[in-house]
Amino acid sequence: MQHYKALFTLGIPIVIGQIGVIILGFADTLMIGHHSTNELAAASFVNNMFTLAIIFATGFSYGLTPIVGSLFGRGETHVVGRMLKNSLFANTLLAVLLTLIMWILYLNIHRLGQPEELLPLMRPYFIVLLISLLFVLLFNGFKQFADGITDTRVSMWILLAGNVMNIIGNYILIYGKLGMPEMGLLGAGISTLASRIMMVVVFAVIFFCTRRYHIYKEGFLHNALNRADFLHLNKLGWPIAMQMGMETASFSLSAIMVGWIGTTALAAHQVMLAISQICFMMYYGMGAPVAVRVSNFRGQNDRINVRRSAYAGFHIMLFIALIGALPIFLLRNELGGWFSDSPAVSVMVAQLIIPFIIYQFGDGLQINFANALRGIADVKPMMYIAFIAYFLISLPAGYFFGFIMDWGIIGIWMAFPFGLTTAGILYYLRFNRDTK
């Protein structure tokens, strides 16, 4: 029972923070969808492109967690601050690289087969989110440091505050309240940028100007950037980034295929992504402490508790899958109407709930054992597994079901269970082999 208790103690603040992200996603989709269906469709496409970049960057920042977790497990707190400094530097360089890549995508957005009427809505929203990318990566660096030392509450409160700020900003700027102009989708982007800047500033103030992290601040301030640490972070971070990036690409690239079907399908796809965030973020919230606990026990060379922590995490994932998916299934005919005034969107959302329910087991399985593998720093094989599961299975299956079998958007979504479950099984087999 100690493992379940420890995972819940670490995980619940992360889950609460992620619920804040979910509420923000719901609020964004609700407010944009009721302002304009075209804006909802434009937001769907742009958000999918940025989700790919942000998840890739988040995966890279995860390279810090097993390092900090192992150092913390051994009591080497003096090294942790130095690792954070190198992590923030590495994240900044990655932000520059991703910004250049996304800028190239922006210049070619008209070549991606999206509806012409959506392009004037997509472009300004895209630029504002592009500016915010650096702040996402800096926050990730601070958050993974805090998670690695088992201090998950600070991130929770900052995330919740940022989300409240974003929702209020959305309401004011999308609809033009309190004397502000009615900006629609662009207003949602500006609100997102402001909240992301605020979250980084608050975390930096807590780290540098309070005593909460003073033992780590000394290592941060009194050590220069270190080539060995930088390379170590990259060695762990890039495979995780590739693994998470390919997983997200199976959704983001699917959005391009959905765009070929039309504006209604894109709007339904965005609604389903907002709904799917409920279970995904809860899995993520409980998966992060699996990586932390596993890395702590790995630092102590305690293989038995490494395994017990991972399997306890999987049991929790199964429980979350049940309590998360059941109410969504029961409300499937009502959910679409919460997000859009279009009856066609509502009908399509109800149909997409079925493949969504099917892939919950595979999603929980792959998130849990991906985090367990991160905790033991066995990350390179995950990259190859992700390529097989998402690029060789999920994306081709989506095209086959969606267009060759002519199932449309339902066919595209029916491919996700195949990719996620394949990844989950292969991650489990790898972890089981590593820890025998």
Regions found by a protein language model. Name each.
Residues 61, 129-147, 155-163, 188-203, ...:
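Short runs within selected transmembrane alpha-helices of multi-pass transporters and secretion channels
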Residues 9-28, 128, 139, 162, ...:
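Transmembrane helical elements of multi-pass membrane transporters/channels
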Residues 37-48, 122, 126, 189, ...:
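Small-residue hotspots at the loop-to-helix junctions and early N-terminal turns
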Residues 2-30, 34-35, 51-63, 67, ...:
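N-terminal transmembrane alpha-helices
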Residues 14, 18, 29-30, 66, ...:
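Transmembrane alpha-helix boundary and packing residues in multipass membrane permease domains
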Residues 19, 23-41, 109-116, 172-185, ...:
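Helix-terminus/linker motif at the lipid-water interface of multi-pass membrane proteins
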Residues 1-14, 68-134, 180-238, 294-359, ...:
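Short alpha-helical transmembrane segments in multi-pass integral membrane proteins
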Residues 40-103, 136-155, 255, 268-330, ...:
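Small-residue-rich hydrophobic transmembrane alpha-helices
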